[in-house]
Regions:
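PLP-dependent class I/II
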Residues: 1-27, 34-261
Length: 261
């Protein structure tokens, strides 16, 4: 006789892939510890944190929660490409302000921009996509009263953008909270990084490639950014790379060639 004990409400597949959720949860906590292991100060993050499918996923969820997205000139181009008319540089019109730190436009500290944004008393999302490939950057967010979310990604550190995974710290109610409670984990991207966090610290890329970046920038007569992928310039020669007030030259291929990566 068929028992009704195994009848459930949610739609579940007949065959379920065997996944070790203990390893997944362990990775989530290891990721948090890894972030805080940097020689750069990391303080003042929201207490709740969730694994996301990279920061792009976190942005898409943010777009669902807030209508007008405020940004500074030179910010990460995805926001305008994805949201078009919902993105504004008039922060007084924004429902949330997204700021990359280091800043996408030059790879330098964004604390000056965060201070300005904080005066608007609107929720702030800090995008730390360049964490793990930067130096001399202070990630102390305790001075600010309006930071609701801070996101980190491993794509730039490990070159693993095709296996995206990030960690979103937030005081807001994001859809990812529902994912987690309903057992919709981002296992594939996380699994790719299970052992990688043990092989490199958040400062390893700078230690390995920082001097090469400086050498290349010297040869090109440009200024090294605090994010090692970039050199900065204000001449007409490189104006096609202009991002906001600065020409941002991505030299990652040159670094790879120089080091025979």
């Amino acid at each position: 006789m068929i028992s009704s004990d195994k009848i459930i409400g949610p739609a579940k597949p007949i065959i379920t892939e065997n996944v070790n959720m203990g390893d997944y949860i362990k990775f989530k906590n290891k990721f948090n510890t890894w972030i805080h292991s940097s020689v750069q100060s990391v303080i003042g993050l929201p207490k709740k944190y969730y694994i996301v499918s990279g920061l792009t996923d976190a942005f898409n969820q943010t777009y669902a929660l807030y209508n007008k997205i405020g940004i500074f000139e030179g910010e990460y181009g995805y926001h305008k490409l994805a949201m078009k008319d919902r993105v504004t540089t008039d922060l007084s019109q924004a429902d949330i302000i997204i700021i990359s730190h280091p800043f996408s436009g030059d790879g330098m500290s964004s604390h000056d921009k965060i201070k300005i944004a904080d005066t608007y008393n609107k929720p702030i999302f800090i995008d730390c996509a360049f964490f793990g490939i930067c130096r001399n950057i202070n990630f102390d967010f305790t001075p600010y009263k309006n930071i609701h979310s801070v996101g980190f990604s491993l794509s730039k550190t490990f070159g693993s953008g095709l296996h995206r995974v990030g960690l979103l710290y937030t005081s807001d109610s994001y859809p990812v909270e529902v994912y987690e409670k309903s057992m919709y984990p981002f296992v594939a991207g996380a699994e790719h990084h299970y052992d990688l966090l043990d092989k490199m610290s958040p400062d390893s890329m700078v230690e390995k490639y920082g001097e090469i970046q400086k050498t290349i920038c010297k040869e090109l007569n440009i200024v090294p950014s605090d994010t090692i992928l970039f050199g900065l310039d204000n001449s007409i020669e490189y104006s096609r790379y202009k991002r906001g007030d600065t020409n941002r030259l991505c030299i990652s291929y040159l670094i790879a060639s120089y080091n025979n990566v």
